[in-house]
Regions:
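Bacterial Sec-dependent N-terminal signal peptides
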Residues: 14-40
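Envelope-exposed proteins and targeting segments
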Residues: 49-51, 57-59, 71-75, 135-137, ...
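Acidic/histidine-enriched alpha-helical segments
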Residues: 110, 114-118, 167-185, 196, ...
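Active-site-adjacent, His/Asp/Glu-enriched structural segments that form or flank metal-binding
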Residues: 69-71, 79-194, 212, 222-240, ...
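Conserved small/polar residues in nucleotide/adenosyl-binding loops
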Residues: 2, 7-16, 493-501
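Scaffold signal of the M16-like zinc-metallopeptidase fold and its non-catalytic homologs
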Residues: 103-105, 130-135, 151, 155-158, ...
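Proteolytic maturation boundary segments
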Residues: 38-63, 250-338, 342-344, 403-407, ...
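Structured mid-domain segments that build the active-site/substrate or prosthetic-cofactor binding neighborhood
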Residues: 319-399
Length: 501
């Protein structure tokens, strides 16, 4: 979707109750109470212009015709697997495997995959790329000139090979060890080092504590090639894979080619279960302070954890309603934070809030505040954003603030609707990848425009103020401060207490 997505409303019981309350508020304007309580939350429609299917082996595909740009298409394969699936002796292998997808497949040995794509204008590292994260791995071949003879067939064949036919040659594996070691040595930024330090404390006692995708160089430099092959065979399988093709193509023809090309990949009998690991709650705040000589400024993260919306609960209109509500909350709070930057001596350099995954975990969300502080007044910057969050929790927002934020939200939605025929391939691809990986809704802008314009006027500011009280509570707080390693710079110890508003 074009609009910023925010989600989550506290623990499961409170979220379900609040969704029902919001739906009642929306219906009450046109129904009597008996009709209201007889209603069930309707499902979110799926955009009729995307074709979605699933092969017998479990592989899912998404296909959409889009002519911007003309004669171009994007080809993606998303895997519901990342570094969280690694065992201790495999740390770094999800990322290593991503590298190996460009170092030899059954139909594209050696470097021929990159060579072929660059011959037709698809540049490695630009239009040909991939990423590995905690819970997912995604590969893309973008901006492909589909009017080039054989380009469509070849790109689908590449996706097929990534899915099931990597060669994983021992010599190529050994060559790649040094490449990844150099990447680890030269590309690890100060923020990445901070994140590695944060994980064990933020996720103590869980699988997330030691799952940074780059892994450990001890494993990367010493694992046996068969260990990588075992990981590939166990986790790269059709029931965890989704193909996305969007562009100036014939949808029927692409669907036929996908069925022909991918149906021969066998489903795995007795396949390992793909687990989604929980995140522990904490009654007392978790406080982290770290320094790095390459960190340019003092930055503080304030996380207020809450339960993530389960995948199966994202299919009804209530999820769009909570998304709308939480987005408006963060927009109003950010407007307040931005106002404080307009004074003669602002308390911080930058501050914002949002609601999304709790750092790296999809099973927990967090209402998150970020503040970049002045080095000579760190405590004021931190206390100011904490005070504004607490003020919003205790006293909520005014009708004037809400009217202004709602109007701005609806203006953005109107603009997206009016320009719906100008969307490029990448924006559709991102939506479909998120639908496959996380079950995020894909109603299409026309359906979303209709639904939001129906429900937004019926949701009062009092409902949003109730939600704010559930997003920020006295438990499940995590505060992390990161600053430069600089002589004379003192970082506060952060004996954390909620400030008075």
């Amino acid at each position: 979707r074009d609009l910023v997505r925010s989600r989550g409303l506290g623990d499961v019981y409170k979220r379900q109750h609040l969704l029902r309350t919001l739906w009642i508020v929306a219906l009450i304007v046109c129904c009597n109470f008996q009709q209201v309580f007889a209603q069930q939350l309707p499902p979110i429609p799926i955009d009729k212009d995307v074709r979605i299917g699933k092969l017998d082996n479990g592989l899912t595909y998404y296909i959409r015709k889009n002519s911007l740009p003309a004669n171009r298409a994007d080809f993606y394969i998303a895997q519901k697997v990342g570094s969280i699936q690694e065992e201790d002796n495999q740390r770094g292998l999800a990322h290593f495997l991503e590298h190996m997808c460009f170092n030899g497949t059954t139909h594209f040995p050696g470097n021929s995959l990159i060579q072929y794509l660059e011959r037709i204008g698809v540049k490695f590292g630009e239009n040909l790329n991939a990423y590995t994260s905690i819970d997912e791995t995604v590969y893309n071949i973008s901006n492909v000139p589909v009017n080039t003879p054989g380009a469509i067939d070849s790109c689908l064949l590449i996706l097929h090979d990534w899915s099931n036919d990597l060669t994983l040659d021992t010599k190529e594996i050994d060559k790649e060890r040094g490449v990844i070691n150099e990447e680890w040595r030269t590309r690890m930024s100060a923020m990445q080092r901070f994140q590695e330090k944060m994980l064990p404390a933020m996720f103590a006692g869980t699988k997330y504590a030691n799952c940074f995708p780059i892994g450990t160089m001890d494993v990367v430099m010493n694992f046996k090639p068969q260990t990588l092959r075992d990981y590939y065979e166990k986790w790269y399988r059709p029931d965890l894979q989704g193909i996305v093709v969007v562009g100036d193509i014939d949808v029927d023809a692409i669907e036929s080619l996908i069925k022909k090309r991918f149906s021969d990949i066998p489903a795995q009998p007795n396949a390992a279960k793909r687990e989604y690991y929980p995140v522990n709650d904490n009654q007392e705040p978790i406080v982290l302070v770290a320094r790095d000589k390459e960190q340019p400024y003092v930055q503080t993260f304030i996380f207020n954890k809450h339960q993530a919306t389960p995948r199966e609960e994202k299919n009804n209109v209530g999820y769009l309603m909570q998304d709308y509500a939480v987005t408006l909350i963060t927009n109003m709070l950010n407007a307040r934070l931005n106002e404080l930057l307009q004074v003669a001596n602002p308390p911080y350099i930058y501050a914002t809030t949002y609601d999304d995954d709790f750092f790296v975990a999809k099973t927990k969300d967090a209402f998150t505040g970020i503040v970049v502080c002045k080095e000579d007044n760190i405590e004021e910057g931190i206390s100011t954003i904490l005070r504004e969050i607490e003020r919003a929790r205790q006293f909520g927002f005014t009708e004037t603030e809400y009217s202004r934020a709602r109007a701005e939200y609806l203006r953005h939605l109107e603009s997206a609707f009016q320009e719906r025929d100008k969307r490029k391939n990448e924006s559709y691809v991102k939506e479909y990848v998120r639908h496959f990986l996380d079950n995020e809704p894909i109603p299409g802008i026309a359906n979303e425009y209709t639904i939001i314009n129906q429900i937004a006027p019926a949701i009062p500011v009092t409902a949003l103020n109730q939600i704010m009280q559930q997003l920020v509570t006295d438990s499940n707080q995590v505060v992390a401060l990161f600053g430069p390693e600089k002589e004379g710079l003192s970082l506060p110890c952060l004996l954390y207490t909620s400030p008075s508003p």
